[in-house]
Swiss-Prot record:
Its job: Odorant receptor.
Gene3D superfamilies cross-referenced by the UniProt entry: Rhodopsin 7-helix transmembrane proteins
Record lineage: Eukaryota, Metazoa, Chordata, Craniata, Vertebrata
Keywords: Cell membrane, Disulfide bond, G-protein coupled receptor, Glycoprotein, Membrane, Olfaction, Receptor, Sensory transduction, Transducer, Transmembrane, Transmembrane helix
Localization terms from the record: Cell membrane
Cystine residue pairs: C97-C189
GO cellular component: plasma membrane
GO terms for MF: G protein-coupled receptor activity; olfactory receptor activity
Membrane topology (Cytoplasmic): 47-54, 121-139, 218-236, 292-312
Extracellular side: 1-25, 76-99, 161-197, 258-270
Protein name per its UniProtKB record: Olfactory receptor 8K3
Recorded superkingdom: Eukaryota
Length: 312
């Protein structure tokens, strides 16, 4: 064991999504298309909510940061995954692996709390409309975004440093298509009980606390909606529709990964779920908000008309 502890690992080999040669080209084309749509959609949402004068409300402030999160973790994973489809050996350096893990944890963790902040914003807008501008002031919105960034950066650095200061045994094949904390643990020679406990505790705290905020907000929203007339209900459902869809898809995927029985848990199952929340969800989110939000649709139409007037 002592000899294993002295083994230096300079790089890792990612097993990728599949080792079936016939699937490499079609999967590359599929995921490239998904990634390009995701980047364009989220960049477009960031620019639109920043520049359009009618989208300068707390809801779109949070939506801009949600798009930034989606762009962040999809870009942390996507380009390297695409490169792996066209090379013979899916190699990632030791330090790039650590960097990828750190950024991924920041973005994916922050998204949980951004979605929570958005649900609270919806609660205030529907249940306390007269006090909305007072409660959801610019300073409050900035704090609700800054805290998740700082907290998740701390957790990310803690987990990444803990893992990469432990000893690897020399076996460097990661059973995944990117560097994530759980697939890295079997490669460690050192006792992993402490880091496993850290990951479990913070994953549970993040997932449960953010989900409770979302559930409580929607429970109070539902109570308020039941007291409204039919026109008010329709407007409230329209306001909540896009966010609720995103919440169900995102939390549903994470709960599928972490709540399934240990006997049925496998890295292959995790790969499928990971593909969904690292690539598919970041592509879907801007589409959901574009299709289900009237303000965003009108802003897109105004922007398109302005571009047509400039170039035509």
């Amino acid at each position: 064991m002592e000899q294993h502890n002295l083994t230096t690992v300079n790089e890792f080999i990612l097993t990728g999504i599949t080792d079936i040669a016939e699937l490499q080209a079609p999967l590359f084309a599929l995921f490239l298309m998904i990634y390009v749509i995701s980047v364009m959609g989220n960049l477009g949402m960031i620019v639109l909510t920043k520049l359009d004068s009618r989208l300068q409300t707390p809801m779109y402030f949070f939506l801009r940061h949600l798009a930034f999160m989606d762009l962040g973790y999809s870009t942390t994973v996507g380009p390297k995954m695409l490169v792996n489809f066209v090379v013979d050996k899916n190699i990632i350096s030791y330090y790039f692996c650590a960097t990828q893990l750190a950024f991924f944890l920041v973005f994916i963790g922050s998204e949980l709390f951004i979605l929570s902040a958005m649900s609270y914003d919806l609660y205030v807008a529907i249940c306390n409309p007269l006090l909305y501008t007072v409660i959801m002031s610019r300073r409050v919105c900035q704090v609700l975004v800054a805290i998740p960034y700082l907290y998740c950066t701390f957790i990310s650095l803690l987990v990444t440093i803990k893992i990469f200061t432990l000893s690897f045994c020399g076996y460097n094949v990661i059973s995944h298509f990117y560097c994530d904390s759980l697939p890295l643990l079997p490669l460690l020679c050192s006792n992993t009980h402490e880091i496993e406990l850290i990951i479990l505790i913070f994953a549970a705290i993040d997932l449960i606390s953010s989900l409770l905020i979302v559930l409580l907000s929607y429970l109070l929203i539902l109570v308020a909606i039941l007291r409204m007339n039919s026109a008010g209900r329709q407007k409230a459902f329209s306001t909540c529709g896009a966010h609720l869809t995103v919440v169900i898809v995102f939390y549903g995927t994470l709960l599928f990964m972490y709540v399934q029985p240990k006997s049925s848990h496998s890295f292959d199952t995790d790969k499928v779920a990971s593909i969904f929340y690292t690539l598919v969800i970041p592509m879907l989110n801007p589409l959901i908000y574009s299709l289900r939000n009237k303000d965003v649709k009108y802003a897109l139409r105004r922007t398109w008309n302005n571009l047509c007037n400039i170039f035509v």
